[in-house]
């Protein structure tokens, strides 16, 4: 029983100790232990020596990447690529995913491939992509899956208008796929159209199980990170990121609801430009879920979407999948869930061949990066251990070969991708005299000898490589010795010049000693190689003797074959003699019959007995003849088999002889190389001795030079001390006199410079104040004149509007009265005509002479005709009257709407003029209030320096701020369910929305930031942001604008400004979705929300990265000003104050180039900083211009 249980675990593909896993284990151990540091240990070296060749032979027989011919790259991800491949043996087309082991080991959460491999390998469902093979090499993992030539649903959504009927069909299939996945105990967590592939028949299958996680016994998962695509992630997963939480399979049903909405509407239900806004919409899904007016969506579709996109406890499908299958949305007359797999899909992909890739995007082929191999470790690190047990085969493997062989009572050897077929001997030894067992032993021994020769050849080649390495080391050592000699010469020269070279000489001595030690090590290694070469030579002699024995054995086999042929010839001669005897017996029988006929009836009785005897003899000879014929056929077969064996043995002998000659040549070459190495080594030894003598000479000369140098240095120090003592005395006297002269000179220069600067400052200040007063007087006069002109225009517009409205009302009343009169006259006329007609029809004509009287039946018939005619005529007249009435009412409605539009237009113009007048009045009042202050400056101009600018307006302090140009504008605060978008497809198969940008001409000066519609028409202002209203400017990141082209992102910047004229409640947040509650005082007015960034994003506080593909750092983002920071900065209190005031508005602008964007951001920051500190400067914040712009009304 125990043996049966062990055998069952060995052949079970789901068992962790099956045969494939054991082969993976021994391969991984050999690869991880085969490093120089570990091979110094005797036990590891013995292990590698025993199993290295076995592992290499097993790897050559198992499935590998070269068994598939790569056709095209059809997908690329973070860990690897997906290739379209064709199996070289069966010509079947597959999709092969190739994953890099090194990348997966570096990532913390990279064990996703186990779930993906197990689900696809063991899923028994037609709705899940099937795994055919899984194998590995030291660098990569390979998963060979069935090819889905129809592409994904994203490609279908971009190519066709998806109807509700199509949505129903594809939703039913994805429900079946998720039901199968949940029954296996897994949750997908990333259900989206990108992971739904279309098969050759048009049905879809679920794929990409890298995000799957195993449920526990309660059907839930405990996780602390939010995994999935932002647009499809459920609120319970998003709410609990950063802390452990439990959720079940209902998270997949949420994604199905988003998928149905996207199929019907064309975009996801909670989409927003910024990632934080998307998360906010998901968290507040009760109010943010809305259905557009176009396209029309049925009540059943809306109901199932609402039930999917609901709270987790109430979500459809939480209890079981039958709740979903029984929903009214899936009711139709074409298919049911039982017949779904046999139903006709809406679209069957058109394919030109089995490897057609027209439904996939073109992906650029990359060269493989050889630098991504595992670095050579310094100790055992087990790089291959995490991948033990990954190998799998759905078609054939050693396990299935064993099972199939056991069922047929004959175990056949097989390997995963190259099954070995053992050819049975063609003879059984009866004809040649060689026993079958002995013949098989000869063949096996020949194969083993061949393998030993090959291994010997490999060892010789490795020895040759090591000899070349020794040669290289010798050359490097020679060059190093030459360098040391040159360095010694240089140091000697430096000694003569007085440089301190003791340290250098010591270092050279140490290096020379190290080189001697290294040379000794090389000599020892060379001696080891000599011993190994001698050992290899001895092995070669043994192998030669064994080869000679094999030749003798082969000759013996040939001699036995010759004897067999001679025996066959003798049997053939015996057969010919039997044929001759048979012919003679036939002639004797014929003669006896003739004699019997001549003798007559007398001898008939005797003849009968003779005939019976002859018949028995004839039967006996016929049997002997048949037996001889069979023997001859068997001998023929044996001879043919012996000839075949002879040719096979001859071929093997020829191969062995050729290998032997090659081995002899290699051995000769190796001997010559060894002699060359010995000669080179002698040269190196001689050179080393010469260098040692040279170094000793140099050391002696260095010691002599050191003694001479020390004497010189002592004398030089004495003379230097005497000269320094005298120099110090003279220098002190000279410095005192020089300092006195310089002090006097500096005092006089300072007084002169101060006098000149004061005069210049006084003159410049006087000119600036006079110029400022003149300019403001001129501006005040222009403002007053403009104000009067605008007031006159306003009065004229009011009068004109009043007159036009009065005239229009009178005209409308008159027109309505005329139309009513016409309607009454027409009704009276029609009524009179109808009455006249009825009267004429109702009249009865008098009888003429000769006419018969009208019968009662004819009278009834006539009355019926009159009634029918009257009804028909009345109906037509009433219909025409109704149509005419509707036409008149429609005309009156249009006239009334035109009058209302004109009234609204006039009122809008009047409102704009009123606002402009109020603005001008405010500015005029400010100038009037400021005029006395400027006038008072003139009285104290002689007491002020150039740096005291409290009374000068802000425009002077930053008058060099001037920039203009074309920018593309898009408003972030504009809400629209159907934005103007262009759909594109990225390399990761994601449907992306790229917004259209509108070009405007923008001017920034010392007063305001103004946006115009055109460069030539500067009077058409779109938006004006004045100096005090500008709050914040920054560059955007991919987290702010997710669906923007990567090339456009560096050219975009974000502006925040105040809008006091707008209602603050309109800008308030409709929901508070901050996960970290309650708010802390250290947030500095920010409304933070904790997020995880998977795209490239940086901290606004320290500038370091916030993002990571798998496990990003904890981060916060303000929902108002989009300030991003690390979590620890909030605790440290280093964050800046939020610039959002509750009345702030936002703009997103894009420059033509990255440099243009940087220039605008730099100038705007100067503009903001310059407008803040002015205490007595001209305040322009109150004079807001409420001019409508694209998406804003600043």
UniProtKB/Swiss-Prot annotation:
Residues 961-1171 form the PH domain. It is an enzyme of class 2 (transferase). It catalyses: L-seryl-[protein] + ATP = O-phospho-L-seryl-[protein] + ADP + H(+); L-threonyl-[protein] + ATP = O-phospho-L-threonyl-[protein] + ADP + H(+). GO terms for cellular component: cleavage furrow; cytoplasm; cytoskeleton. The active site is at residue 190. Activated by rho-1 binding. Residues 784-846 form the RhoBD domain. GO terms for biological process: actomyosin structure organization; cortical actin cytoskeleton organization; embryonic morphogenesis; mitotic cytokinesis; oogenesis; regulation of actin cytoskeleton organization; regulation of cell junction assembly; Rho protein signal transduction. Negatively regulates mel-11 to relieve the inhibition of mlc-4, allowing contraction of the circumferentially oriented microfilaments in epidermal cells and thereby regulating myosin II contractility during spermathecal contraction, cleavage furrow contraction in early embryos, and embryonic elongation and morphogenesis. Required for P-cell migration. May also play a role in oocyte cellularization. Its EC number is 2.7.11.1. It is found in: Cytoplasm; Cytoplasm, Cytoskeleton; Cleavage furrow. Keywords: ATP-binding, Coiled coil, Cytoplasm, Cytoskeleton, Developmental protein, Differentiation, Kinase, Magnesium, Metal-binding, Nucleotide-binding, Oogenesis, Phosphoprotein, Serine/threonine-protein kinase, Transferase, Zinc, Zinc-finger. This is Rho-associated protein kinase let-502. The gene is let-502. Its cofactor is Mg(2+).
């Amino acid at each position: 029983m125990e043996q049966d249980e062990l055998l069952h675990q060995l052949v079970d593909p789901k068992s962790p100790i099956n045969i494939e896993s054991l082969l993976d284990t021994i391969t991984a151990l050999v690869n991880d232990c085969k490093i120089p540091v570990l091979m110094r240990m005797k036990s590891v070296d013995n292990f590698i020596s025993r199993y290295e060749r076995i592992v290499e032979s097993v790897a050559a027989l198992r499935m590998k990447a070269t068994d598939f011919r790569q056709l095209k790259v059809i997908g690329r991800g973070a860990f690897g690529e997906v290739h379209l491949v064709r199996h070289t043996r069966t010509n079947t087309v597959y999709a092969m995913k190739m994953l890099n082991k090194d990348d997966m080991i570096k990532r913390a959460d990279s064990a996703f491939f186990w779930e993906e491999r197990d689900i696809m390998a063991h899923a028994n469902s037609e709705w899940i992509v099937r795994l055919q093979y899984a194998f590995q090499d030291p660098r990569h993992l390979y998963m060979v899956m069935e090819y889905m030539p129809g592409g994904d649903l994203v490609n279908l959504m971009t190519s066709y208008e998806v109807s509700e009927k199509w949505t129903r069909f594809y939703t039913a299939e994805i429900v079946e796929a998720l039901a199968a996945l949940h029954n296996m105990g897994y949750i997908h967590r990333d259900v989206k159209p990108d992971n739904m592939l279309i098969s050759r028949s048009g049905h879809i299958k679920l794929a990409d199980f890298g995000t799957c996680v195993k449920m526990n016994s309660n059907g839930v998962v405990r996780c602390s990170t939010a995994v999935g695509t932002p647009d499809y992630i459920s609120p319970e997963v998003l709410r609990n990121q950063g802390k452990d939480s439990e959720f079940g399979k209902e998270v997949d049903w949420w994604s199905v609801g988003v998928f149905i909405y996207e199929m019907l509407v064309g975009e996801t239900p909670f989409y927003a430009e910024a990632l934080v806004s998307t998360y906010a919409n998901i968290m507040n899904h009760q109010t943010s879920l809305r259905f557009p007016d176009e396209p029309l969506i049925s009540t059943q579709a809306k109901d199932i979407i609402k039930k999917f996109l609901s709270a987790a406890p109430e979500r459809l499908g939480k209890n079981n999948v039958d709740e979903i299958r029984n929903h009214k949305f899936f009711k139709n007359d074409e298919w049911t869930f039982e017949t779904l797999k046999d139903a006709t899909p809406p679209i069957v992909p058109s394919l030109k061949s089995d490897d057609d890739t027209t439904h996939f995007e073109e992906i650029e082929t990359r060269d493989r990066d050889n630098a991504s191999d595992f670095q050579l470790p310094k100790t055992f690190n087990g790089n291959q251990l995490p991948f033990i047990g990954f190998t799998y085969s759905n078609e054939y493997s050693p396990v299935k070969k064993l099972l199939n062989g056991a069922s047929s009572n004959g175990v056949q050897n097989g390997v995963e991708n190259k099954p070995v077929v053992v050819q049975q001997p063609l003879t059984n030894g009866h004809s040649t005299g060689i026993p079958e067992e002995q013949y098989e032993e000869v063949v096996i021994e020949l194969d083993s000898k061949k393998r030993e020769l090959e291994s010997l050849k490999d060892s010789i080649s490795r020895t040759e490589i090591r000899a070349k390495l020794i040669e290289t080391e010798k050359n490097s050592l020679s060059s190093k010795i030459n360098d040391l000699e040159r360095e010694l010469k240089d140091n000697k020269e430096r000694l003569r010049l007085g440089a301190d070279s003791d340290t250098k000489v010591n270092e050279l001595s140490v290096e020379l000693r190290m080189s001697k030690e290294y040379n000794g090590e090389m000599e020892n290694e060379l001696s080891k190689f000599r011993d190994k070469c001698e050992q290899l030579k001895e092995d070669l002699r043994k192998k030669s003797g064994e080869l000679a024995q094999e030749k003798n054995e082969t000759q013996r086999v040939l001699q036995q074959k010759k004897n067999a042929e001679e025996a066959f010839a003798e049997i053939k001669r015996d057969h010919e003699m039997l044929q001759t005897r048979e012919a003679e017996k036939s002639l004797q029988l014929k003669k006896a019959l003739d004699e019997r006929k001549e003798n007559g009836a007398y001898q008939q009785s005797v003849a009968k007995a003779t005939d019976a005897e002859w018949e028995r003899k004839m039967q006996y000879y016929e049997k002997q003849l048949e037996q001889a014929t069979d023997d001859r056929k068997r001998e023929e077969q044996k001879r043919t088999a012996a000839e075949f064996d002879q040719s096979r043995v001859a071929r093997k002998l020829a191969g062995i002889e050729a290998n032997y000659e090659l081995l002899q040549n290699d051995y000769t070459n190796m001997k010559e190389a060894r002699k060359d190495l010995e000669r080179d080594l002698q040269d190196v030894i001689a050179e080393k001795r010469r260098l040692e003598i040279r170094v000793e000479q140099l050391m002696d000369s260095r010691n002599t030079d050191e003694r001479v140098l020390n004497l010189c240095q002592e004398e030089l120090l004495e003379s230097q001390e005497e000269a320094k003592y005298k120099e110090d005395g003279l220098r002190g006297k000279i410095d005192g006199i020089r300092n006195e002269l310089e002090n006097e000179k500096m005092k006089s220069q300072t007084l002169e410079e101060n006098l000149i600067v004061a005069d210049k400052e006084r003159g410049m200040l006087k000119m600036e104040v006079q110029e400022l007063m003149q300019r403001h007087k001129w501006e005040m006069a222009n403002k007053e004149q403009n104000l009067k002109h605008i007031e006159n225009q306003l009065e004229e517009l009011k009068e004109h509007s009043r007159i036009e409205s009065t005239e229009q009302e009178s005209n409308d009343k008159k027109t309505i009265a005329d139309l009513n009169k016409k309607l009454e006259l027409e009704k009276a006329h029609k009524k009179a005509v109808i009455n006249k007609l009825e009267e004429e029809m109702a009249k009865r004509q008098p009888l003429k002479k000769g006419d018969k009287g009208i019968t009662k039946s004819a009278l009834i018939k006539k009355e019926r005709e009159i009634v029918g005619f009257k009804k028909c005529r009345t109906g037509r007249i009433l219909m025409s009257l109704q149509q005419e009435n509707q036409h008149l009412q429609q005309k009156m409605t249009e006239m009334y709407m035109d009058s209302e539009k004109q009234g609204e237009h006039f009122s809008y113009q009047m409102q704009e003029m009123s606002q402009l007048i109020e603005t001008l009045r405010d500015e005029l009042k400010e100038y009037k209030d400021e005029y006395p202050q400027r006038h008072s400056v003139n009285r104290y101009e002689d007491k002020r320096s150039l740096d005291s600018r409290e009374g000068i307006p802000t425009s002077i302090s930053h008058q060099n701020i001037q920039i203009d140009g074309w920018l593309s504008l898009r408003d972030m605060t504009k809400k629209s369910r159907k934005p103007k978008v262009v759909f594109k497809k990225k390399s990761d198969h994601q449907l992306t929305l790229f917004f259209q940008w509108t070009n405007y001409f923008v001017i920034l000066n010392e007063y305001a930031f103004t946006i115009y519609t055109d460069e030539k028409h500067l009077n058409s202002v779109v938006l004006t942001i004045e100096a005090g209203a500008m709050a914040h400017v920054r560059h955007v990141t991919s987290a702010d604008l997710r669906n923007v082209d990567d090339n456009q992102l560096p050219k975009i910047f974000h502006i925040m400004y105040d809008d006091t004229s707008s209602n603050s409640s309109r800008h308030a947040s409709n929901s508070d979705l901050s996960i970290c509650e309650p708010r802390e005082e250290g947030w500095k007015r920010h409304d933070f929300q904790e997020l995880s960034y998977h795209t490239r994003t940086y901290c606004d506080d320290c500038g370091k990265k916030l993002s990571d593909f798998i496990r990003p750092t904890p981060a916060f983002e303000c929902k108002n000003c989009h300030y991003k920071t690390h979590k620890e900065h909030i605790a440290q209190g280093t964050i800046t104050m939020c610039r959002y005031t509750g009345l702030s508005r936002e703009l997103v602008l894009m420059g033509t180039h990255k440099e243009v964007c940087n220039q605008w951001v730099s100038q705007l920051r100067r503009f903001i900083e310059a407008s803040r500190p002015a205490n007595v400067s001209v305040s322009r914040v109150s004079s807001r211009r409420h001019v409508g712009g694209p998406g804003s009304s600043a």
